[in-house]
């Protein structure tokens, strides 16, 4: 009984301690039964059965019920507020208790029930605001800077903003405990927390909790007309009719936590700049045309964590009207809705430093990154996943310039036909797309277009593409398709790893490019293509390109040996204009199994090879093809086709230097084929094998040539008359060809030329022997080679072209 009486007396005493703002603590056997700020208590009453103390707030609602028998002792926490150095406002239902030590120093406070108005001319006044009211507000008019601590404040206004800093002063808001601000839906002000001047948010480090919860029923959750700076604390916008946080100037977010789960419009909307240097921000906007973050000025992020999600149509995760820069921190953006974008800028986007960015988009016609001007990246790690049809990973109107960092992109949407000027035009799902040029000098690229992406492009420029560095792993697996443009006009669309409508320059970098869909291209340009640099190091540029998809029938033909139809053929490397190879290591394969059309290297104009280490293998068509002229001036070159020509040109051909082996299939296919056009040989070592060969044009050739008629699979050795070995070569076993053409069979023509061949000299040609030892490269032997058995013939070279019978039947 005495314990109960003692506790009751202490509880009654506690009700007079509001000015000290202590916490009341009930103990039981060394444990805390209950703790609450005294300012939260509106009353305490007692139950007789069981004998208990009931704690109510100022509105009469029960906070807790504690059995008297369980209480060992009662103490007060040391959160003491010296009443002489700050203004203390304690809201209590429809009333408020005010302690104003500066009444004679220019601070006037008026009270109308729970609505408090402050007028201050004093500089640096500290305010401490606490308590609870469902029908109260605080308006501050000050022409000088002030500091306000919110401590376990729950304030709901019945008519206006919960807190309104009505004049343009600098406000430091210190968060202590758990605070909630709610405005009235009919308020004429812009937000539950309205700040006319600058706002800085910090936390009270003596308290373990520093939360501000805001409900904006009239318009915004928080509105700041000046600069808003957040250094610490947790801000939760529980709901808002419009923007979660709205600002007319800048936002400087240096630390603390922000949560905006469902604003009525945008999450953050600032007319100035936004700088994020730390903290954690989680923003989700779900209405149509919403922006998770909207900024009229510069957006810059150096550190911290930013998580943004939007789900409405025509929405933006981050929308910047000016330059957007991310050079640190972690950014995650999730996008849904028709035509929505992850990160969008009207000017320039720059990814730098240690930035970690992940964007996932399911938006139809959406973009993970969208710039109406340029996009640059020189560092960071970016992962983009977009699955909507005709969507883009990176889309720019201006130049894409990438010099470093890591990009991983999965583009699983597909192509759609759009109507433009009464014609069907394909719109693609593309990983990186520029309406102008793409310039890449470094970085790591992992790009995948799965089978769901029909006809998509990995890296695509409407203008020129220039790549001078970087490590590229690109795979396209979706099939292309034929479509009707209008009336009876047909066309097709196919996937590409690298695609430019203008010119393309590949001077350095490592490329592993794979295209498996029908009609797929590895590298495709509508203009000229330049590979490598003059006299460059072959190790500086590594090109591994493979296609395996079959051709697409666009229009059917009328039969005949070539069919006569129109096809979209798979190509590993294709240039609509001139193609020049200066250096680099190229390994190019077309492994189609059903139809021809899969050429490894093709130019629809001229092909010039000045250098490089080139190997091209085609299973069903020419390994290398040019339309008007093919010239080899240098480099090491190997071309092989199982079913067609090794090296083919529909116009003229010139072999002026380099080392070449070119293998075609059985008759009528050839190692070197330029039909009946000029075939010029002036230098280099060249071996061409196949069922036949184009005949060199003797009037323009300056280096002697041997045309050796032999058999498929024969070993050939060519020696000077003194026994010096010029060439040891194992002819390939021919495949393909034949059919309805005359000949077929195992007959093979080997065209050979070398600077060691001289007119007026005799040479020994051995054939059908056995080669042992040495080092072999595609049938060509060097080093310590022994040749045994077989037959031989002596050849007198008295003309530019000398025909040799080495067990063959001629062509």
Where are these regions (language model features)?
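Short N-terminal segments immediately surrounding and downstream of signal-peptide cleavage
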Residues: 21-36, 41
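Structured surface patches comprising rigid loops and adjacent beta-strands/short helices at the edges
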Residues: 37-46, 67-76
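A composition-driven surface/loop motif
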Residues: 79-811
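Glycine-centered tight beta-turn/hairpin loop motif at sheet-sheet or coil-to-beta transitions
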Residues: 29-31, 58-61, 723
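Short, hydrophobic/aromatic-rich segments at coil-to-beta transitions
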Residues: 20-24, 50-53, 122-129
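A short beta-strand micro-motif
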Residues: 22-29, 53-57, 89-90, 716-717
């Amino acid at each position: 009984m005495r314990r109960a009486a003692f506790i009751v007396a202490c509880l009654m005493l506690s009700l007079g301690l509001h000015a000290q703002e202590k916490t009341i603590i009930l103990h039981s056997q060394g444990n805390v039964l209950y703790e609450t700020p005294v300012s939260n208590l509106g009353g305490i009453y007692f139950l007789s059965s069981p004998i208990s103390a009931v704690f109510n707030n100022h509105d009469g609602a029960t906070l807790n019920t504690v059995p008297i028998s369980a209480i060992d002792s009662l103490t007060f926490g040391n959160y003491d507020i010296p009443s002489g150095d700050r203004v203390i406002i304690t809201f209590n239902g429809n009333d408020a208790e005010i302690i104003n030590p500066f009444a004679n120093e220019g601070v006037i406070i008026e009270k109308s029930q729970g609505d408090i108005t402050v007028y201050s001319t004093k500089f640096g006044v500290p305010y401490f605001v606490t308590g609870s009211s469902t029908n109260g507000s605080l308006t501050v008019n000050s022409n000088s800077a002030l500091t306000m601590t919110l401590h376990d404040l729950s304030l709901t206004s019945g008519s206006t903003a919960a807190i309104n800093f009505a004049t343009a002063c600098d406000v430091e808001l210190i968060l202590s405990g758990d605070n909630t601000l709610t405005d009235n839906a009919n308020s004429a002000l812009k937000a539950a927390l309205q700040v006319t001047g600058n706002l800085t948010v910090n936390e009270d480090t003596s308290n373990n909790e520093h939360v501000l919860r805001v409900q904006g029923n009239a318009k915004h959750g928080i509105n700041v007309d000046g600069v808003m700076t957040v250094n610490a604390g947790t801000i939760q916008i529980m709901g808002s009719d419009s923007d979660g946080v709205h600002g007319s100037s800048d936002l400087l977010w240096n630390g603390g936590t922000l949560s905006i789960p469902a604003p009525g419009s945008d999450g953050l909307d600032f007319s100035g700049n936004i700088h994020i240097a730390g903290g954690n921000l989680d923003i989700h906007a779900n209405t149509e045309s919403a922006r998770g973050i909207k900024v009229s000025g510069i957006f810059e992020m150096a550190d911290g964590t930013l998580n943004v999600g939007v789900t409405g149509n025509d929405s933006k995760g981050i929308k910047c009207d000016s330059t957007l820069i991310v050079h640190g921190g972690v950014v995650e953006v999730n996008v849904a809705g028709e035509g929505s974008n992850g990160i969008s800028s009207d000017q320039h986007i720059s990814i730098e430093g240690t930035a970690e960015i992940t964007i996932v988009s399911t938006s139809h016609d959406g973009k993970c990154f969208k710039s109406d001007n340029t996009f640059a990246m020189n560092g960071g790690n970016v992962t983009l996943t977009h699955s909507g049809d005709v969507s883009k990973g990176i889309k720019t109107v201006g130049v894409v310039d990438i010099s470093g960092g890591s990009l991983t992109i999965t583009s699983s949407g597909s192509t759609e036909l759009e109507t433009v000027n009464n014609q069907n035009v394909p719109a693609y799902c593309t990983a990186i797309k520029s309406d102008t040029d793409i310039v890449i000098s470094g970085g790591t690229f992992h790009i995948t277009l799965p089978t769901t992406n029909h006809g998509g492009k990995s890296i695509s420029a409407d203008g020129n593409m220039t790549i001078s560095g970087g490590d590229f792993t690109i795979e396209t697996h979706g099939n292309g398709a034929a479509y009707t443009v209008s009336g009876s006009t047909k066309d097709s669309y196919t996937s590409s790893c690298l695609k430019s409508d203008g010119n393309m320059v590949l001077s350095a970098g490592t490329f592993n490019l794979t295209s498996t869909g029908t009609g797929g291209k590895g590298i495709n340009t509508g203009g000229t293509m330049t590979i490598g640099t003059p006299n460059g190091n072959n190790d500086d540029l590594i090109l591994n390109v493979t296609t395996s998809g079959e051709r697409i029938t666009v229009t059917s033909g009328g039969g005949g040996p070539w069919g006569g139809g129109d096809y979209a053929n798979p190509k590993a490397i294709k240039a609509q204009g001139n193609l020049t190879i200066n250096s680099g290591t190229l390994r190019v394969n077309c492994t189609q199994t059903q139809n021809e059309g899969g050429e490894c290297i093709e130019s629809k104009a001229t092909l010039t090879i000045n250098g490089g280490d080139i190997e091209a293998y085609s299973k069903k068509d020419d390994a290398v093809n040019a339309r008007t002229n093919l010239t080899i001036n240098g480099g090491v070159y190997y071309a092989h086709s199982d079913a067609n020509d090794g090296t083919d040109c529909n116009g003229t051909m010139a072999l002026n230097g380099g080392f070449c082996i070119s293998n075609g299939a059985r008759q009528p296919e050839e190692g070197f084929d330029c039909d009946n056009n000029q075939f010029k040989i002036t230098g280099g070592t060249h071996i061409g094998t196949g069922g036949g060969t184009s005949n060199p044009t003797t009037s323009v050739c300056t280096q002697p040539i041997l045309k050796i008629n032999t058999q498929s699979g024969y070993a050939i050795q060519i020696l000077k008359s003194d026994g010096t070995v010029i060439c040891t070569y194992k002819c390939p076993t021919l495949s393909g060809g034949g059919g309805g053409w005359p000949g077929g069979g195992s007959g093979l023509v080997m065209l050979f030329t070398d600077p060691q061949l001289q007119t007026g000299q005799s040479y020994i040609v051995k054939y059908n022997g056995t080669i042992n030892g040495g080092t072999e490269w595609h049938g060509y032997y060097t080093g310590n080679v022994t040749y045994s058995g077989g037959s031989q013939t002596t050849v007198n070279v008295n003309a530019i072209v000398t025909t040799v019978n080495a067990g063959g039947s001629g062509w």
